[in-house]
């Protein structure tokens, strides 16, 4: 099947021009101006932007949410992500209670995602049960196509928490095999103390979620993680950065040439902590996430850090937890609200609306942070994350003239709310190709459930490149 996309404004992280793209089978065969090639289908993209398919490097599909042993929304709900212009996710493969790292990865590929995923996917390994065998398993990552591993400095007292000694050992082992370490950087011991103090005082509404997760606990953990990674010369990627204090620590480290970078999320760029003050529990609970939402000055600092290249990706942290049932667990105690919100289907248009349309990001920087850098960071570039001859034909045709409002009904996500319901939306994903197949047309999913496949990642990804 040959498809010719004609006359669109092609935007990559490096350039922008009006041109054509010839897709042949799964890949891009030719790019240029005034291509005159035979094709089975011609798509008129005049007046539209043509982007590489988005790469969302931080999602939690089909993950245990610790309320009644229920999972978050599964891979069958990735249709929302692809309608929103994301063609590849890098999902987390948490270590299951009765499995090692590798068995958990295999189970996710062959059971959880099989015949369900609408998007292609790579995987991060994620340590949740510390045992000596995990260090031997990390040595197998290159043969399994796993280029990254995530650890949690927070959640002391739970299986998720990794102590500093184990963190250091994981850094050393990851460096040996060429893996990048992702870190959730919050001081878990202090957070536990602050949360317990709120409970003792009867401060139980969602407002106190923010109060008990202050910015300094993030900044301190970022500083400590950077220092430990520096001792092993292991590339470090700091997940979900939210505040000025943490950004300052990142900037200092990069100034010394250390191999460290970070991401932020759509909601940290577009929403502030005041939403947690809503007297309607259901509305406030939607926004309970970790780290907590911050203030307007932090939002602006995040936008600036993206523009400057200090932060390299915008992710969604998609976590499909409904309000009507699961978040009710914390109605009388905010510490029991399961953290997380859906967002994979809204990432592109929200970053476009709040970033590009306001002049905070250029179009090329937009492509860089929603597609190119996430692909590079995770070892799947240039197969993913760009428009280039030989790359997978993952293509988004975007209508910049669309003006509307975000509604769950327009792009259902498998749970009972959209985090951005009622917000202004400028621009819309109109058509999406996944490996050459049209899977979104007129902003509606027309693909096949199970069309997505596992994408093995290459080791020694961009974090291992020359020091900054």
Annotate each PLM feature.
Residues 45-116, 133:
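Metal-associated gating/positioning segment near the N- to mid-region
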Residues 204-233, 286-287, 308, 312-314, ...:
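His/Asp/Glu-enriched, well-ordered alpha-helical/loop segment
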Residues 8, 21, 26, 47, ...:
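Divalent metal-coordination and catalytic microenvironments
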Residues 102-119, 168-183:
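Alpha-helix-loop-beta-strand connector modules within alpha/beta enzyme cores
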Residues 328-333, 339, 389-455:
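C-terminal cap of metal-dependent C-N hydrolases
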Residues 1-52:
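Histidine-rich, glycine-flanked metal-binding segment
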Residues 133-314, 330:
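Histidine/acidic residue-rich metal-binding segments in metalloenzymes
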Residues 90-91, 122-125, 235-240:
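Short catalytic-loop micro-motif centered on adjacent basic/acidic residues
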């Amino acid at each position: 099947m040959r498809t010719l996309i004609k006359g669109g404004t092609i935007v990559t992280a490096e350039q922008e021009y009006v041109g054509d793209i010839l897709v042949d089978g799964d890949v891009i065969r030719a790019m240029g101006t005034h291509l005159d090639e035979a094709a089975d289908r011609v798509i008129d993209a005049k007046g539209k932007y043509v982007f590489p398919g988005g790469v969302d490097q931080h999602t939690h599909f089909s993950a245990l949410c610790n309320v009644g042993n229920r999972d978050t929304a599964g891979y069958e709900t990735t249709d929302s992500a692809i309608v929103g212009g994301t063609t590849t996710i890098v999902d987390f493969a948490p270590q299951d209670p009765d499995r090692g790292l590798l068995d958990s990865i295999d189970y996710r590929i062959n059971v959880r995602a099989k015949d369900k995923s609408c998007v292609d996917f790579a995987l991060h390994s994620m340590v949740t049960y510390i045992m000596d065998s995990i260090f031997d398993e990390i040595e197998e990552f290159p043969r399994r196509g796993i280029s990254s591993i995530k650890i949690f400095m927070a959640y002391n007292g739970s299986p998720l928490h990794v102590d500093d000694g184990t963190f250091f050992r994981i850094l050393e082992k990851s460096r040996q095999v060429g893996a990048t370490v992702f870190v959730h950087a919050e001081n878990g011991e202090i957070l536990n103390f602050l949360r317990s103090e709120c409970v003792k005082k009867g401060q139980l509404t969602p407002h106190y979620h923010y109060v008990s997760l202050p910015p300094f606990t993030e900044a301190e953990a970022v500083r400590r993680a950077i220092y430990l990674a520096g001792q092993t010369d292991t590339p470090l990627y700091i997940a979900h950065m939210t505040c000025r204090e943490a950004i300052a620590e990142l900037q200092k480290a990069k100034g010394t040439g250390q191999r460290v970078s970070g991401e932020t999320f759509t909601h940290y760029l577009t929403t502030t902590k005041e939403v947690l003050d809503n007297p309607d529990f259901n509305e406030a609970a939607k926004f309970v996430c970790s780290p907590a939402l911050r203030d307007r000055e932090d939002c602006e600092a995040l936008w600036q850090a993206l523009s400057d290249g200090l932060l390299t990706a915008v992710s969604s942290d998609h976590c499909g937890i409904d309000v009507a049932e699961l978040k009710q667990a914390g109605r009388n105690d905010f510490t029991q609200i399961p953290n997380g919100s859906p967002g994979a289907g809204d990432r592109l248009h929200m970053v476009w609306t709040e970033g590009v349309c306001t002049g905070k990001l250029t179009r090329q920087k937009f492509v860089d942070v929603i597609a190119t850098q996430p692909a590079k960071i995770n070892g799947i570039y240039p197969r993913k994350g760009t428009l280039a001859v030989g790359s997978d034909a993952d293509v988004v045709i975007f209508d910049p003239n669309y003006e509307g409002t975000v509604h769950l009904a327009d792009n259902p996500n498998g749970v009972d709310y959209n985090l951005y319901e009622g917000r202004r939306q400028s621009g819309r994903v109109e058509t999406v190709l996944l490996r050459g197949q049209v899977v979104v047309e007129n902003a509606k999913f027309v693909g096949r459930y199970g069309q997505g496949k596992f994408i093995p990642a290459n080791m020694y990804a961009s974090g291992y490149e020359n020091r900054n």
